[in-house]
Protein backbone atom coordinates (compact mmCIF):
# COMPACT_ATOMS: atom_id res chain seq x y z
CA UNK A 1 0.00 0.00 0.00
CA UNK A 2 1.32 3.42 -0.97
CA UNK A 3 0.75 5.94 1.85
CA UNK A 4 0.72 9.66 1.09
CA UNK A 5 0.70 12.51 3.61
CA UNK A 6 -0.63 15.97 2.87
CA UNK A 7 -0.39 17.43 6.34
CA UNK A 8 1.45 20.70 7.01
CA UNK A 9 4.49 19.70 4.96
CA UNK A 10 5.09 16.42 6.79
CA UNK A 11 6.79 13.80 4.60
CA UNK A 12 5.17 10.66 3.17
CA UNK A 13 4.54 7.85 4.00
CA UNK A 14 2.19 8.44 6.92
CA UNK A 15 3.87 9.98 9.95
CA UNK A 16 4.06 8.40 13.36
CA UNK A 17 0.99 9.40 15.41
CA UNK A 18 3.14 11.39 17.86
CA UNK A 19 4.00 13.80 15.02
CA UNK A 20 0.31 14.61 14.48
CA UNK A 21 -0.80 14.67 18.11
CA UNK A 22 0.04 18.37 18.79
CA UNK A 23 -2.34 19.48 16.04
CA UNK A 24 -5.19 17.91 18.01
CA UNK A 25 -4.13 17.86 21.66
CA UNK A 26 -1.89 20.94 21.89
CA UNK A 27 -2.82 23.94 23.97
CA UNK A 28 -6.08 25.64 23.04
CA UNK A 29 -5.61 28.37 20.47
CA UNK A 30 -2.59 26.54 19.00
CA UNK A 31 -4.44 23.47 17.78
CA UNK A 32 -4.64 23.04 14.03
CA UNK A 33 -2.18 25.87 13.37
CA UNK A 34 -0.18 25.07 10.26
CA UNK A 35 3.02 26.59 8.93
CA UNK A 36 1.39 26.77 5.51
CA UNK A 37 -1.62 28.95 4.76
CA UNK A 38 -4.29 26.25 4.87
CA UNK A 39 -6.93 24.69 7.09
CA UNK A 40 -6.89 21.30 5.39
CA UNK A 41 -4.95 18.05 5.47
CA UNK A 42 -5.24 14.54 4.04
CA UNK A 43 -3.92 11.04 4.51
CA UNK A 44 -4.18 8.88 1.39
CA UNK A 45 -3.81 5.12 0.88
CA UNK A 46 -3.41 3.85 -2.68
CA UNK A 47 -3.83 0.11 -3.05
CA UNK A 48 -5.46 -0.49 0.33
CA UNK A 49 -6.96 -3.80 1.42
CA UNK A 50 -4.33 -5.84 -0.44
CA UNK A 51 -4.98 -4.27 -3.85
CA UNK A 52 -1.62 -2.54 -4.36
CA UNK A 53 -0.80 -4.89 -7.26
CA UNK A 54 -3.87 -3.73 -9.24
CA UNK A 55 -3.88 -0.83 -11.67
CA UNK A 56 -5.81 2.37 -11.17
CA UNK A 57 -8.91 1.13 -13.05
CA UNK A 58 -8.55 -2.57 -12.29
CA UNK A 59 -10.23 -2.73 -8.89
CA UNK A 60 -7.53 -1.03 -6.80
CA UNK A 61 -8.95 0.34 -3.55
CA UNK A 62 -7.88 3.86 -2.63
CA UNK A 63 -8.77 5.60 0.60
CA UNK A 64 -8.80 9.35 1.14
CA UNK A 65 -9.03 10.71 4.68
CA UNK A 66 -9.68 14.44 4.47
CA UNK A 67 -9.50 16.81 7.43
CA UNK A 68 -10.66 20.43 7.69
CA UNK A 69 -9.98 22.17 10.97
CA UNK A 70 -10.69 25.40 12.76
CA UNK A 71 -9.19 26.26 16.17
CA UNK A 72 -12.56 27.12 17.73
CA UNK A 73 -14.92 24.46 16.29
CA UNK A 74 -12.75 21.39 15.84
CA UNK A 75 -12.21 19.14 12.84
CA UNK A 76 -14.44 17.81 10.08
CA UNK A 77 -13.34 14.38 8.82
CA UNK A 78 -14.26 12.68 5.57
CA UNK A 79 -13.38 9.03 4.90
CA UNK A 80 -13.75 8.09 1.26
CA UNK A 81 -13.18 4.55 -0.03
CA UNK A 82 -12.91 4.28 -3.81
CA UNK A 83 -12.85 0.95 -5.63
CA UNK A 84 -11.28 2.07 -8.91
CA UNK A 85 -12.90 0.88 -12.10
CA UNK A 86 -16.02 -0.42 -10.36
CA UNK A 87 -17.93 2.76 -9.63
CA UNK A 88 -18.32 1.54 -6.04
CA UNK A 89 -17.44 4.41 -3.76
CA UNK A 90 -18.29 4.96 -0.12
CA UNK A 91 -18.03 8.26 1.70
CA UNK A 92 -18.56 9.04 5.37
CA UNK A 93 -18.40 12.31 7.26
CA UNK A 94 -17.88 12.95 10.94
CA UNK A 95 -20.98 14.35 12.61
CA UNK A 96 -21.52 15.96 15.98
CA UNK A 97 -24.71 18.00 16.11
CA UNK A 98 -27.48 17.82 13.53
CA UNK A 99 -28.94 21.10 14.84
CA UNK A 100 -25.97 22.89 13.22
CA UNK A 101 -26.22 21.46 9.72
CA UNK A 102 -27.70 24.76 8.53
CA UNK A 103 -24.80 26.95 9.73
CA UNK A 104 -21.53 27.05 7.88
CA UNK A 105 -17.79 27.47 8.04
CA UNK A 106 -16.18 28.93 4.90
CA UNK A 107 -12.85 27.17 4.47
CA UNK A 108 -9.59 28.54 3.07
CA UNK A 109 -10.66 27.72 -0.47
CA UNK A 110 -14.17 29.17 -0.26
CA UNK A 111 -16.12 25.96 0.26
CA UNK A 112 -18.92 25.91 2.82
CA UNK A 113 -19.05 23.06 5.35
CA UNK A 114 -21.88 22.53 7.83
CA UNK A 115 -20.66 23.22 11.37
CA UNK A 116 -22.61 20.20 12.64
CA UNK A 117 -20.04 17.98 10.88
CA UNK A 118 -17.13 19.28 12.99
CA UNK A 119 -16.12 17.24 16.04
CA UNK A 120 -13.96 18.17 19.05
CA UNK A 121 -10.20 17.94 18.59
CA UNK A 122 -9.89 15.12 21.13
CA UNK A 123 -12.42 12.98 19.24
CA UNK A 124 -10.78 13.79 15.91
CA UNK A 125 -7.42 12.73 17.34
CA UNK A 126 -8.80 9.34 18.39
CA UNK A 127 -10.18 8.82 14.87
CA UNK A 128 -6.96 9.91 13.14
CA UNK A 129 -4.85 7.66 15.37
CA UNK A 130 -7.20 4.73 14.73
CA UNK A 131 -7.08 5.40 10.96
CA UNK A 132 -3.27 5.26 11.03
CA UNK A 133 -3.17 2.13 13.20
CA UNK A 134 -5.68 0.20 11.05
CA UNK A 135 -4.14 1.01 7.64
CA UNK A 136 -6.97 3.28 6.60
CA UNK A 137 -10.05 1.48 7.91
CA UNK A 138 -13.04 3.63 8.82
CA UNK A 139 -12.46 4.52 12.49
CA UNK A 140 -15.05 3.18 14.92
CA UNK A 141 -14.19 5.65 17.70
CA UNK A 142 -16.47 8.44 16.41
CA UNK A 143 -19.94 8.79 14.91
CA UNK A 144 -20.15 8.92 11.11
CA UNK A 145 -22.88 9.72 8.64
CA UNK A 146 -22.85 8.12 5.20
CA UNK A 147 -22.49 10.56 2.33
CA UNK A 148 -25.77 9.33 0.83
CA UNK A 149 -27.53 10.23 4.12
CA UNK A 150 -26.18 13.77 4.37
CA UNK A 151 -28.65 16.56 3.74
CA UNK A 152 -27.94 18.17 0.35
CA UNK A 153 -26.98 21.44 2.05
CA UNK A 154 -24.20 19.95 4.21
CA UNK A 155 -21.64 20.88 1.52
CA UNK A 156 -23.32 23.51 -0.70
CA UNK A 157 -22.18 24.10 -4.25
CA UNK A 158 -19.26 26.55 -4.37
CA UNK A 159 -20.55 28.62 -7.28
CA UNK A 160 -21.15 32.28 -6.32
CA UNK A 161 -24.79 32.18 -7.42
CA UNK A 162 -25.56 29.26 -5.13
CA UNK A 163 -23.44 30.45 -2.21
CA UNK A 164 -25.25 33.79 -2.20
CA UNK A 165 -28.23 31.92 -0.72
CA UNK A 166 -26.10 30.71 2.20
CA UNK A 167 -24.17 33.86 3.13
CA UNK A 168 -26.43 34.74 6.04
CA UNK A 169 -25.72 31.33 7.56
CA UNK A 170 -21.90 31.55 7.43
CA UNK A 171 -20.87 31.96 11.06
CA UNK A 172 -17.10 31.36 10.75
CA UNK A 173 -14.53 31.97 8.05
CA UNK A 174 -10.95 30.89 7.61
CA UNK A 175 -8.40 33.36 8.94
CA UNK A 176 -4.66 32.77 8.49
CA UNK A 177 -2.85 31.92 11.70
CA UNK A 178 0.04 33.90 13.15
CA UNK A 179 3.13 33.97 10.93
Task: Locate each region found by the language model.
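Acidic, proline/glycine-rich low-complexity IDRs
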Residues: 1-44, 81-179
Amino acid sequence: MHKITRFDGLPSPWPEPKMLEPYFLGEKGRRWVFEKDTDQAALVAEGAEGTEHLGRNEGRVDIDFFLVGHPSIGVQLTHRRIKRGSGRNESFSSISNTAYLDRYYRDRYGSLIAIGLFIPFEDAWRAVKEFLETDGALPKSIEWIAGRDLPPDAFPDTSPLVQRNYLSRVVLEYRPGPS
